[in-house]
Amino acid sequence: MTSELGIFYRSDFDRAWCDMSAETIKFTDSAAQRVSELLAEEGDQNLKLRVYVTGGGCSGFQYGFTFDEVVNEDDTVVEKNGVSVLVDPMSLQYLQGAEIDYTENVSGSQFVIRNPNATTTCGCGSSFSV
């Protein structure tokens, strides 16, 4: 079952949970393009980008990115331009309303999460608190 935003649901319970939260996760075109390029380099188009939140960093929580072949039963899957992003339920509560982007500028290039739930961030921007 798919919503108009490319979010896939495994059950009606998941749909109810995702309708209130996952549809507010934004995955930009530039992020999808960069992930697509990385997948081409890996040579495995079955990989998906997993975005997660874990404890750590100077502000209490930090973001993580990894490629994953396994879609867990309780994962939320967001698709954009043929790229799949996986978010586990624990991370989803911290990422509600967030935008996942990829930026390039004179300082370098990086994936950026703009998270409205983050009340403070560290100086380097790699950790946050809620």
From Swiss-Prot:
Superkingdom in the source lineage: Bacteria
Cofactor: iron-sulfur cluster
Cofactor annotation remark: Binds 1 iron-sulfur cluster per subunit.
Binding positions (iron-sulfur cluster): C58, C122, C124
MF terms (GO), sorted A to Z: 2 iron, 2 sulfur cluster binding; 4 iron, 4 sulfur cluster binding; iron ion binding
BP-aspect Gene Ontology terms: iron-sulfur cluster assembly
Biological role: Required for insertion of 4Fe-4S clusters for at least IspG.
Family: Belongs to the HesB/IscA family.
The UniProt record lists the keyword Transcription: no
Provenance organism: Methylococcus capsulatus (strain ATCC 33009 / NCIMB 11132 / Bath)
Keywords of the record: Iron, Iron-sulfur, Metal-binding
Encoding gene (name): erpA2
Pfam families the record matches: Fe-S_biosyn (PF01521)
Record PROSITE patterns: HESB (PS01152)
Assembly and interaction partners: Homodimer.
Listed name of the protein: Iron-sulfur cluster insertion protein ErpA 2
